Structures are given as structure tokens and as C-alpha cells.
Amino acid sequence: MPLPTMTHSSSFLRLPATSSPHPPPADDASAAYAVVVLNQRLPRFAPLLWDRARLRVCADGGANRVFDGMPELLPAEDPDQVRMRYKPDVIKGDMDSIRPEVKEYYSNLGAEIVDESHDQDTTDLHKCVSFITRNPPGSEESNLYILVLGALGGRFDHEMGNINVLYRFSNIRIVLLSDDCSIFLLPKTHSHEIHIERSIEGPHCGLIPMGSPSASTTTTGLRWNLDNTSMSYGGLISTSNIVEEETVRITSDSDLIWTISLRN
């Protein structure tokens, strides 16, 4: 029996007036976006995604990044007005990184502060994703996209913890984003169609079997396609591949990490 197909698109990074050579996936128009901001430098497109999101959550010190970083990304605007406009709905985590004055500022503006310092077994991103899945901004979980800003860069163990969250919540569409690339999980329960937004992403990409080896992965749309190919750490992994077509199709017997470069 063929696997059900999951479609993917980075159309959320497309500027509002930008056209695309192909329409977004059918479920894209009904997508409900939630943004999570972690404690790393904001990517250049943070204001765009913030405006598209229905729910905005800062993970602890991520609130500092919004407070400091949004005015830097919008230098032509009054910093105080920017800070008031880009107010998180929720600040959640251990509360060991957020500056006291930032916490007070957003609390006074009505942000919900959720102190989970009692929980030292999960990361701040895990806590935020758990909160969003319990309080989804849309009516259907299948339409939920969680866009994570600041998930890459900084300490390697933090990056690996963030990637682990993709596996912990494999039934949720979670995209890790930096200025340089995006990363998301391709669950083995589905075949996958990735609609490439050439104006904003590519051409470099990778398919990585981080959770477990893959005995069989097949792709189309790449320069170096895989044909029932096995992949594992210590063996072959598909890095520095090149997107050749508008749609990349992937099937695998293992969960895979997909990553693609983002254009400046």
C-alpha cells in the first residue's frame, strides 16, 4: 500500500508581493503559523514571520532577542514603537536568561509569563512546542506549522537538543530556521513532496539519517538522486546535494532530516 503524501513549502518566507512559478501546496492557504524565538540572533526575516504568525512564543532569553533585535532589523522605525508592536503572546521557560527589565516590560504589555524552572528534564524549545500543541492557533493540528527562530548557531549541544525536538514531536510540522538554512523532519510514515521556492532557497540541500540508519531512500528532483540507497553515519549521507527541479520527492524507511540553504 502506498504511503500517504506530505507536502512541504517554504512559502511562508515569500514576501507578500512575490509571485511563485508554482502554486503553494493545497494546505498552505489554511496553514496556522506559530513562531518560537530562541536565545540566538534573530534572522533577517523575523519581522515577516512574526507578522504571519497567529501565536508568538519566546523561549526565556528569546524575549531579550526580540526586545533588542526587532528595532535593529527595522532601523527606520521608532524603537519604542517597534517593541510595542512586536510583543510576544507568551514567554515560557526556565526564566534564567530573560533580563528582569525585559520580563517586566512585556508583562506590563500583557504577555503571559509561564515559569517552568521546576522542569529541568526538557529544553525551553520542548516546553514551548508542548504549550503550542496544547493551545494551537488553528482549528486543526494538521494545519499547524511551528517556525523556530534562533534554533541554529551557538552551542552545538543546543542545536542537537533542538533537532531532537523534531523527533519528539514528529507528528507536528516544525521548521528550524537561521539566516543560512532551514531544517525539518521527514517522517518515514509518509512520502514527501517538497515544493522548492527558488527565489528564497537552494540550491544546496541535504538528507541526513540522524535518528537511525536508512536501508532504503529514494529521491527525485536532486542532482545526485538516491535510488533505494542505504544511508548511515559512518557510511553514506547526502550532504552538499543540489536541487535541480521545482519539486523534490522523497521516500525512506527511516525518519530523515531535510535541510536546504536560504538565499540572501
Curated annotation (Swiss-Prot):
Kinase among keywords: yes
Assigned GO CC terms: cytosol
InterPro entries reported in the protein's UniProt record: Thi_PPkinase, Thiamin_pyrophosphokinase_euk, Thiamin_PyroPKinase_B1-bd, TPK_B1-bd_sf, TPK_catalytic, TPK_catalytic_sf
Entry's Gene Ontology BP terms: thiamine diphosphate biosynthetic process; thiamine metabolic process
Keywords, alphabetical: ATP-binding, Cytoplasm, Kinase, Nucleotide-binding, Transferase
EC code: 2.7.6.2
Region (Disordered): 1-27
Compartment(s) of residence: Cytoplasm, Cytosol
Segments of skewed composition (Polar residues): 1-12
Main enzyme class: transferase
GO molecular function: ATP binding; kinase activity; thiamine binding; thiamine diphosphokinase activity
Pfam families (alphabetical): TPK_B1_binding, TPK_catalytic
Main location as per UniProt: cytoplasm
Top-level taxon of the source organism: Eukaryota
Record pathway: Cofactor biosynthesis; thiamine diphosphate biosynthesis; thiamine diphosphate from thiamine: step 1/1
Reactions this protein catalyses: thiamine + ATP = thiamine diphosphate + AMP + H(+)
Function: Catalyzes the phosphorylation of thiamine to thiamine pyrophosphate (TPP). TPP is an active cofactor for enzymes involved in glycolysis and energy production. Plant leaves require high levels of TPP for photosynthesis and carbohydrate metabolism.
Protein name: Thiamine pyrophosphokinase 1
Organism: Oryza sativa subsp. japonica (Rice)
